[in-house]
Regions:
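Pyridoxal 5′-phosphate
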Residues: 1-183
Length: 183
């Protein structure tokens, strides 16, 4: 909930962090090196004003809705999706969703494959023919793919958001059913 590229770092007074880059501070422009004081020492160049404003808006939205409400809706959407796709012939769902942690928390991400179809092909069909955005490939997790034996195929990842709807979940499940029937 907010743009990428903006974050925060809490650092104790004794931490000796070296700047990643240096440049104008906007306050002490004639200094050749970054000032020693934190946070200015780590803030080279122009701050990401739009990103900071977006981050603030995202935090305000989280506070308004509540993390528990967001999690509950995302979990409900994920469970509805799983219930619809688990019986599709040829579909493989990765992960053990029956063994949730004691607190029941599980991120609202489901990775699948359809038989031996390339994950990029499935993801392209979902986007181009159904308007459904997914992410295909290795997802920066080569060891996981080695474990599942999907190094060459990859996986199609569905990520559910508080702003998704049950209708969208139904459409995604129906699209997978149709794609599985095409192979």
């Amino acid at each position: 909930m907010g743009p990428q590229g903006t974050g925060g770092l809490y650092v104790g007074e004794r931490a000796d962090i070296k700047p990643f880059k240096s440049g104008g501070t906007g306050v002490l422009s004639f200094l050749e090196n970054q000032p020693m004081e934190l946070p200015t020492r780590l803030e080279a160049g122009t701050l990401n004003g739009p990103g900071i404003a977006g981050l603030l808006t995202g935090v305000m939205e989280l506070e308004k809705i509540g993390l528990d409400n967001i999690y509950a809706k995302e979990h409900e959407l994920m469970q509805a999706f799983m219930g619809k796709i688990k019986t599709i012939p040829g579909i493989r769902i990765y992960g053990d969703f029956d063994m949730l942690p004691d607190n029941g928390l599980h991120c609202a991400i489901v990775s699948v494959n359809i038989a031996d179809m390339d994950s990029a092909e499935v993801s392209d069909i979902l986007m181009n023919e159904y308007g459904i955005a997914t992410r295909s490939g290795i997802h920066c997790a080569p060891l996981m793919h080695k474990f599942f034996g999907t190094q060459n195929q990859g996986m199609v990842r569905f990520s559910f958001s508080y702003y998704n709807t049950v209708d969208e979940i139904n459409e995604a499940a129906e699209a997978l059913m149709q794609i599985a029937g095409m192979r």
